[in-house]
């Protein structure tokens, strides 16, 4: 059945085009998106990307890394970064022409192992460094024309010396090239160096360039071309025709003389090179000038030093020699002994042909020869130099004694005269010998006239190298330092003097000596100064610490001894007051407070009760009641000031006695309660006369002054304690009154009481 007009076969592609369309669809589906305003052609197996005149400021980062050909021409890319072409191992052709590239990062093309053509022309490159083109091992075409390149490093082309075929460095500012690297480009076909500032080509540069077919040196500053077998290939005969070679060197200021005669003899056509010099050949076509006119002029010396130059020994002298010729001659100098002079520590030849001798010697006396040479010949001119010797300080003796021949100045020379002479050896003395130094002495050398200096030579038995020391002629001793310990040394002293017969410096052996240095010192060496200082500091610190510890121990022992003595004194005698265990005070009707106070060292007299009759005890209680009422009245009259008496037990009393000794306590109303029993020990203020209270010394326990009294309770004499007017009942408790001597009448029993400030405490608060 034939297909209808609307059959699906009308919309299906032809069978022959189906594989091609599938291939295009597969390539498009696998490829990355094309950068904006760029044209991408993904025709397998080639991926081409064209981004010309798109205004790019840098290399787009979205470029497919599988691209084979990339053209980024006519943009504004200013720099090539390291990451711009990273991992583009399939890139074969890269064009960056007509941009503003001024910087190329090191290793920017390191991943382009398959790159064959690199176009960087019409940019702003100023130099080509050795690390910029690294990694281009398969490069065939390198186009760097129309830049601002002034310098090309010698290692810039090392990566592709054996593979490059086309090198273009035209329209730059090059004054020189690494000609040695260019000579190793064995596969080079085209070398374009036109419109630069090159003025010299190294001889033998093109010897190995057998495949070179085009050399363009147009518009440079070349004056001549070195003869090279490269230019003679087209003239060689034989069954094999020569390789065609095109050499262009027009626009150079060629100097047409005999040095370019080899080039004139070549058969060339349609070349319009002209001559710039000499004057009679200016602006004439190079190939139209007859060979007879390519002439050279031999050198002519136009200026030289006078026929004779006088100079004092040791001073400098300059010998001038100028020559003219075509080509410009080169000047050399020859010494009086026939040596060709060059630049050394004593002589220097300038570029204009002047010879400078910085230090003249007597051997410089004679005729120096100036030689000027070029391709046409050479010219010579002699210059005589007369060196005047230095005058001697003392005139030589009229008849000097006969001397042996001057010996060698080297101690290592065998058979030196006087070296083994016993007389000379006795003249030299080695004194003050140590492991690293020795002092050498020798007598004055009167028979030798005009001694300039002494030379000391010595070497070790384990080392054949000589050590030289030059010392003044006035010295007769020399200290040799830096010697090795335990070694044998040979030492000789030589006198350097003026030989009157030859007018040259001569040497004579003064004497020789052999000695052996002392052995190594003991392995235990004294401590160095800084170590010794540290040890002294540690020792002094230890002494100080030990002294402090001893002082502390003594203080502790003393404190313990005195503490034990005080306790024994308290327990055994009545001269030391007992330690206070409680302090009872009352202020303005407040409750009793207790505080501990340190014992006072003051001595008081204590009155102990031996036997108290019942009648006396009743009278004492009656007197207490009377005094209590009087105290209440006085307290009210003083504006609320109150006084309290506390009976403090001593350490000798037992617990029951302490409870029995507790004195009457004052109630909230200010009345004293009756005592439970008579106290065996009473703490009273010494002295019979009552004392007026001192308001300026009153203290109050209302605040936190209890702690103050505890930490700062200093002992006070009983006579400084003020008696309160509320205590007269203590004076009459025994039926008697206190006398001037402090005795109290207690019936038939009288005793002496010792009072302490801690056993009787009086407080008065206003």
Swiss-Prot record:
Disulfide bond annotation, renumbered to this chain: 321-370
A single cellular component GO annotation: cell surface
Organism superkingdom: Eukaryota
SUPFAM superfamilies according to UniProt: Fibronectin type III (SSF49265), Immunoglobulin (SSF48726), L domain-like (SSF52058)
Ranges for domain LRRCT: 252-298
Modification(s) after translation: Glycosylated.
Motif (PDZ-binding): 763-766
Chain ranges of the Ig-like domain: 299-386
Residues annotated as transmembrane: 537-557
Entry similarity comment: Belongs to the LRFN family.
Functional summary from the UniProt entry: Promotes neurite outgrowth in hippocampal neurons. Involved in the regulation and maintenance of excitatory synapses. Induces the clustering of excitatory postsynaptic proteins, including DLG4, DLGAP1, GRIA1 and GRIN1.
Protein name from the UniProt record: Leucine-rich repeat and fibronectin type III domain-containing protein 1
Source species: Mus musculus (Mouse)
GN (gene name): Lrfn1
